[in-house]
Swiss-Prot record:
InterPro entries linked: Formyl_transferase-like_C_sf, MPG, MPG_sf
Intrachain disulfide bonds: none
Record's protein name: Putative 3-methyladenine DNA glycosylase
Family note: Belongs to the DNA glycosylase MPG family.
EC number(s) given by UniProt: 3.2.2.-
Coiled coil: none
Gene3D superfamilies assigned to the protein according to its UniProt record, in alphabetical order: Methylpurine-DNA glycosylase (MPG)
Organism of origin: Rhodopseudomonas palustris (strain HaA2)
Gene Ontology molecular-function annotations: alkylbase DNA N-glycosylase activity; DNA binding
Listed GO biological process terms: base-excision repair
Length: 201
């Protein structure tokens, strides 16, 4: 596990909204810079505290085997949402990165709830704030994300991603729940956050 600079984002404070050009860079640059940013869907959301990077050369990426109807959005322009169903149960949301055709994306794994918390509690059917968005399926349910959001731009309603304020202390480690390229240290998180899906070691 590696760590970078120390400083914490202020939960609830919003930086300027990110535009699509922010995502037109290497997935390995975008992923850590999303830590501390705020993801909102129709005003409901929170601070991003955990993400995973998936590059098109990565055997664990959905795009690794080529374009299909399911992953077509990954091959499109950067700055759009790629939504898929995991294990036939949970929706997961990714942000498409790099140049069109590069087919790389960042999976949003966990949020610290800050906006519309009561709406999240109603959707999730629980009160514990720490459990509302501590996993990709949980956060998608809490924010009301479904396949209807697949292919939508991230810089226009219902989405908004606001730039982080300050430079958070970021930790890295191997990704979770995959069997291919499981040792790649492409999982990024906010150091010390109790809202991540699984603690970093």
């Amino acid at each position: 596990m590696m760590s970078s600079r120390v400083s914490a984002p202020a939960p609830g404070a919003l930086g300027p909204p990110l535009r699509r050009r922010f995502f037109a860079r290497s997935v390995h640059e975008v992923a850590p810079e999303l830590i501390g940013a705020t993801l909102l869907v129709e005003g409901v959301g929170g601070v991003i505290v955990e993400v995973e990077a998936y590059h098109h050369t990565d055997p664990a990426a959905h795009s690794y085997g080529g374009q299909t109807a399911r992953n077509a959005v990954m091959f499109g322009p950067p700055g759009f949402a790629y939504v898929y169903r995991s294990y036939g149960i949970h929706w997961c949301v990714n942000v498409v990165c790099e140049a069109e055709g590069s087919a790389s994306a960042v999976l949003i794994r966990a949020l610290q709830p800050t906006h519309g918390v009561e709406a999240m509690r109603a959707r999730r059917g629980l009160d514990d704030a720490r459990s509302l968005c501590s996993g990709p399926g949980k956060l998608a349910q809490a924010l009301g994300i479904s396949i209807a959001h697949n292919g939508l731009p991230l810089d226009a309603p219902p989405f908004a991603i606001h730039r982080r304020i300050g430079e958070p202390d970021i930790v890295t480690g191997p990704r979770i729940g995959i069997t291919k390229a499981a040792d790649y240290p492409w999982r990024f998180g906010l150091k010390g956050s109790r809202f991540v899906s699984v603690p970093f070691k």
